[in-house]
């Protein structure tokens, strides 16, 4: 709904934009009212009313930048209830793992500012799944799916860096924001020659600062880790 509002504004439809923002606020409140819950002492979300077990899809509010219960949700996602050496369980009630929810969860953890926890999970996942003995693709539900490949989910891995670590979020056809959450284990992170928003730009993060430059090297924006910069191309 918020992205619909941005699109409507770009198209000059302020009435629809306002309606979408109002509906988004109502939905935000409903998510907290219906799904907000304390499970195992952690302030997070329940999958539905009456369910008192953790499920990995509690990560979705973080991916949608709803951080009301970010700390409790981060604790739940990285707890022994859900996280295993070989991946993330879909539910604490069974031993089925699915990389799709794992990749969403890591992206959400970065976006919520829990970058060091997220990076530990990301590094273990990358070494085990993508650089291990198997073909480098995310896998479907295991053991019930027999580790069938989910090749399309490779895009979710990329989104961890773009939307999670760098926090790139569209604000218009030629505008976007950058909110870097770089883990302490990385001394720098650079993405060069990004083609998006009608232009070409690069992002370099090091020494606690993130610098956005255009194709010619001119500085477009600078921000500290955890802060937000608005970029117009």
Go through each PLM region and give its residues.
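A glycine-rich beta-turn/hairpin centered on an aromatic-Pro dipeptide
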Residues: 163, 173-184
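Active-site core of glycosidic bond-cleaving carbohydrate-active enzymes
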Residues: 2, 6, 10, 18, ...
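Beta-rich accessory regions
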Residues: 7-15, 19-22, 26, 31-34, ...
């Amino acid at each position: 709904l918020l992205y619909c509002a941005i699109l409507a504004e770009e198209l000059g439809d302020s009435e629809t934009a306002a309606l979408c923002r109002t509906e988004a606020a109502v939905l935000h409140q409903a998510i907290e009212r219906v799904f907000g819950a304390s499970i195992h002492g952690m302030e997070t979300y329940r999958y539905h009313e009456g369910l008192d077990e953790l499920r990995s899809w509690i990560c979705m509010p973080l991916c949608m930048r709803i951080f009301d219960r970010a700390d409790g949700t981060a604790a739940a996602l990285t707890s022994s209830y859900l996280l295993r050496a070989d991946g993330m369980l879909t539910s604490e009630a069974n031993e089925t793992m699915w990389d799709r929810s794992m990749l969403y969860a890591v992206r959400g953890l970065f976006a919520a500012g829990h970058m060091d926890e997220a990076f530990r999970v990301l590094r273990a996942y990358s070494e085990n799944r993508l650089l291990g003995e198997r073909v480098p693709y995310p896998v479907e539900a295991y053991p019930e799916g027999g580790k069938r490949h989910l090749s399309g989910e490779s895009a979710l891995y990329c989104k961890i860096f773009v939307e999670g670590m760098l926090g790139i979020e569209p604000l218009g056809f030629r505008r976007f924001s950058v909110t870097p959450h770089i883990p302490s284990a990385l001394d720098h992170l650079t993405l060069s020659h990004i083609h998006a928003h009608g232009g070409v730009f690069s992002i370099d993060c090091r020494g606690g600062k993130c610098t956005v430059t255009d194709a010619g090297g001119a500085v477009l924006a600078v921000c500290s880790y955890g802060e937000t910069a608005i970029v117009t191309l």
